[in-house]
């Protein structure tokens, strides 16, 4: 029964597949929006109308990519598929809640799209700062619809987080300790804890904004004793952990991919990797105000947030060097997934380096809200999170589908994407250092060259996305079945064959420690 299987599903594999399909679809929408942005900025002068329309596109691009592409694919897709298989659990702890978590996302997405359709759209940027997001500068229902959309996506993530935490803690075989679970399982659990602690703060902030807009409260209005800076604190207390939520599952996937294709039976420094992720998770909560260096904070406050932010580089460095140590002395197989992982390690490190630059409050005063910041977070997202997703996808595709991708196409796809994203985002560092501000649809002629280069790069990335669609079609059309998977004793998820049966681990697994 199609309806029973796909709409009322309680199977972690089916729900994971739904998440992957939804995320892929949302990714197409987000990519289309990003190309609209780059088309507008390809040359000076106006292309798509006024700055309001431009900012609606920018805002939608951010929300779609974060809440409907990266999070559903990484946590919902890979998390649902792999976590139960990796710990030998029959399913997630709360299978029906798992289904609800997924089905909250399409309505949420619908509300976000609706916000662009009514009035002038929500041209607030993804941060939704008042007073721009207030009912004076944004009259009409657009921002309210965006807020409701975020509420639904937030509830979905909170329920998913509860589910993953419960599953990882309670559904392991009796003999398996927490320190014997694979790193991807750890990364998803830590991500879930971050979601559980940060999302309620966002919910509070946007609910206060909702009442400010509609019920005459003045939480963020100085005229009634409120303060717009309060909103920024609430938002970024969520917003900073959020960026670690987006990258941590990627860390977990990269650990698995690097270990597997180095022919190793375990990653280098397992405990160090776990503690590094826990440290990143903890530190992620105490650095939020580095997004607010320009609002006039006390010098001591700025000194603290600068130092605390730089300390995050230490556990991150532990992870990077542990990946390199895992590669060391290995029998390296240059598969497409390994190329994505190596690309991730290099480009994520470059993104982290520009992050260290921006952590300096004095430098950030100059660079805040310029394209330098855009370049920084797109290096860690577009070449961190997305490369991890791509690597994870080509690595686990045979597990999900039972078919193999064409190796040559996959390598060509990687090469095109690698050139495209670097050509898009590297020039943005130069634009930022020259003072080009973010969120403007037009710019002085002096910035033309690097903007043109950046826009050409974005179209190269588009061809890579189209090639990936072809590649997936080719795999399903050719139906090359999986012959053999190596290293299954240390990669539990492959144990049941490709694809695994509908129900796995129906009896508790016997784990010999």
UniProtKB/Swiss-Prot annotation:
Q: Which GO terms describe its molecular function?
A: cytochrome-c oxidase activity; heme binding; metal ion binding
Q: What is this protein called?
A: Cytochrome c oxidase subunit 1
Cofactor binding, per record: Binds 2 heme A groups non-covalently per subunit. Binds a copper B center.
Coiled-coil regions, chain positions:
none
Q: Which residues bind heme a3?
A: 376
Provide the residue positions that the database annotates as binding O2.
244
Q: Which cofactor does it need?
A: heme; Cu cation
Q: How does it assemble?
A: Component of the cytochrome c oxidase (complex IV, CIV), a multisubunit enzyme composed of 14 subunits. The complex is composed of a catalytic core of 3 subunits MT-CO1, MT-CO2 and MT-CO3, encoded in the mitochondrial DNA, and 11 supernumerary subunits COX4I, COX5A, COX5B, COX6A, COX6B, COX6C, COX7A, COX7B, COX7C, COX8 and NDUFA4, which are encoded in the nuclear genome.
Where it sits in the cell: the answer is:
Mitochondrion inner membrane
Q: Which family does the record claim for this protein?
A: Belongs to the heme-copper respiratory oxidase family.
Describe the reaction catalysed, as an equation. Answer: 4 Fe(II)-[cytochrome c] + O2 + 8 H(+)(in) = 4 Fe(III)-[cytochrome c] + 2 H2O + 4 H(+)(out)
* Matching InterPro entries: Cyt_c_oxase-like_su1_dom (IPR023616), Cyt_c_oxase-like_su1_sf (IPR036927), Cyt_C_Oxase_1 (IPR000883), Cyt_c_Oxase_su1_BS (IPR023615), Cyt_c_oxase_su1_dom (IPR033944)
Q: What does the record give as EC number?
A: 7.1.1.9
Organism encoding this protein: Lemur catta
